[in-house]
Every structure is written in C-alpha cells, then in structure tokens.
Amino acid sequence: MKFHRSSALVVGLVVALPGQHAMAWGDEGHEIVATIAYARLTPVVKKKIDSILAADKDKLTAPDFSSRATWADKWRDSDRNTTRVRYLATHNWHFVDIEIDSPDFDKACFNHPPLPAGKVASKGPADDCVVDKIEQFTAELRSSSTSKGERRLALKYLLHFVGDLHQPLHGADNHHDAGGNAVLILFGNHKVSSKSLNLHHYWDTDLVLQLGKDQKAVADQLNNQISPQDAATWSTGTPKDWAMESFDRAKTIAYDLSGESNRTDKNGKTVPYLDATYDNRALPVVREQLSKGGVRLAAVLNDALK
C-alpha cells in the first residue's frame, strides 16, 4: 500500500486509518505477478536473472525471484518509523496518482524530473512516479555500462514496480484520498462491531486472497489461462499505456461504490459495505491485472536482457 503526498490533509487521513500497511498488491499479489513472469522468461534471460540475484546478499526478503518482487516495499519501510531516509527517498516511486475528475498524467508524474547528471536511477529525485522509474530502471538493466550493484537494484525495483503499476488504485486518486487509502469500508463477514478497513487495502490484499491462499497455485492457474493472443496483445504498449489502463479500472470499477449499502462500524462511522455484487465486478479485474502484470514484467525483462 502507499502513503502519499505530504499534504497535511492526506497525511492526517491516512495515518488515522486502521490496518494501515505499506505495500502494493500485498506480498501475495507481487509474488503472483513475479511467478507468472518467471515462467515466461526465455532460458537465456532466466539464466542472467538467476545470476544477478544469486549475488544479492540483502536479507530483507528471501533470495528467490518471487520473494525479491516484494523487496522495494521492505526497503522503503525499513526506516519508516526511524530516520525515514529510505522511505522519503522512494515512497512516491510506487504509484502515479492520476486524478479521476481531471486526469493529468504529467502532473501525476511530477512533470517527469530528469535524473541529475551523474546520478543513477536508484538515487533519482524523490518526487517521481512509477512510470518514470520503470523506464529508468529498464534502461539501466539494458545498458552494459550499468554497474553490477545498480543493475541488481534495477532488477529488484522492476520486479516490484511493474506489479505496482497494475494495481488500479496505484494509478488513480480521488480528491486527494491517497488512492483509496482514505476511503473507509466494511466487507465480507464484518459486522457492526468491526473496525473499518480502507478501499486501497481491500484491493491490495483482501481481493487477492479471495483467489486462493497458495500464491504459486493461483499464479499457475492464471498463467495457464492466458491465451497466446492475450499475451501478445498485453506485451505491447508502454508503461504510460499500462498506467492509463489501471486508471480506467480504478475509475470505473474500484471507485464505483454507488450501488453499495452502508453499515456503521464500531467507531460509529457510516461506511460503504462491499458485498458480493462489488466483488463480482472487482475480481475479474484483479485476475486480469495480475495476469497482465506477469506478462508485461516478463516482456520488459526479456527485452532488456536479451
């Protein structure tokens, strides 16, 4: 999940939310995307990636490909409650907040700040978006002049950011609600005595877990359902194109609570209750976005390391 802009209003809203986490898709979703992608790497690229990751001594995650897809969240949050150096330097990189009522992609990407002369992408401006970072890290992974350490970082960031880009609420914002973090909801078996969760968390984790709790099994099932035609179509386009897809899914599906009834949580707040009708619209989007994320991550890596 993401913690957005420095606006005092947004900070106050997000900090006050219960169940706040610092991940996108949750570990489960990122591992599903990565597992699909790994199965679609060419043998040559798979060997190169295995070699890059084998030299990685970082202990924030397990060393395998799918676990490394969660690394960028772990790194960002490793000093979130202390010095906040890593957190403040990288937290904006996980999303592109396109306002649903007045979409402005360039504004959501902080007007695309260039990398300062002599700076690598992992040391780039803190005010930048996930689309720019995917493009920068892809260029570094492709370049033979990139140092081994920076190439390893580029790979780990790409494993995560391509997944982030496909979570619809990482591509949209509704009047500074931090991509749905400030939208309180109840769902499932949550009764009046429950605490509210938030819409962003619901898309990060709760909907993904409805697909199954064995991430590899879910990934294998989704991967097996991807037709060659879909894989070919999904592999085209640019990160900006993919961001606009996520924006559309957020605007038309994730944020559409118009048909939901309300319930009162234990704190006396009246909030939308997401029922089976909402899930029946949302779950196909979750399946498709996870599948697209896996196909596109593989396409990015296969092209950069061919």
Which residues does each PLM region occupy?
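Short, Lys/Arg-rich amphipathic segments at extreme N-termini
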Residues: V11-V14, A34
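Bacterial N-terminal signal peptides that target proteins for export
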Residues: M1-V10
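N-terminal, motif-rich segments that launch catalysis or mediate targeting to/interaction with membranes
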Residues: M23-F161, P168, D173-K306
